[in-house]
Structure formats: structure tokens, C-alpha cells
């Protein structure tokens, strides 16, 4: 299982900026599928606070539509893999893609997460 966070405004799409998104949705993802774990409001937290919130939820991978280089470095230093999309992507589509990857041939960074989680 991996834990994935999506910065989202509407809870359906990856459509929020890391620094200004008001919430993120955390999902547990396995080869069988995914389950919504929690919706986390970010409030007025700055970069460090947002990274801590992701860490507190046990997030392995974080998706957003925009993140600055300094913030991305802080996310990586927090042992979270950031993924940035330039366009809005449906959360459901990304969850299905992740489940399929886990079930078949996960890329090295996902394989490493799976091995660490045991």
C-alpha cells in the first residue's frame, strides 16, 4: 500500500497549487484499488507546515498543479515524492493508473515505497 495526497479544490480533480490549495485528499492505494483515507484542510499553513501535515498523514506521493522549486525541495527533504501536473487531472484517473502500476510493473520509486512499507 502507498499513501497518496492530492491537492484539490473540488475533491474530484488535481486542481490546486501546493502553496495556496485549501485542502488535500489522502488515499490508500493498493493493487486492488484505492480508498479515501482523509480530507485535510490546510488553513493558512506555510510550506513547512504543509510538509509536516503530509508527513503526519504518512503520505508517500503528493500531487498538485503547481509547486515552486524551494517548496518542492522541502517536500522531497520530507521524504515525500512530489508530482506536478500542468493541467487539471481527475483524481479517479490517477488512482486507477497507480493501482495498475502497483499490480503490474511499478516504477522504481513506487517499488521502493512498497518495499519500505513491507
What positions do the PLM features span?
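Short, glycine/polar-rich helix-capping loops at beta-to-alpha or helix-loop-helix junctions
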Residues: 67-73
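Catalytic cysteine-centered active loop of the rhodanese-like fold, especially the PTP/DSP P-loop
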Residues: 64
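Non-catalytic interface/targeting segments
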Residues: 1-44, 49, 53-57, 77, ...
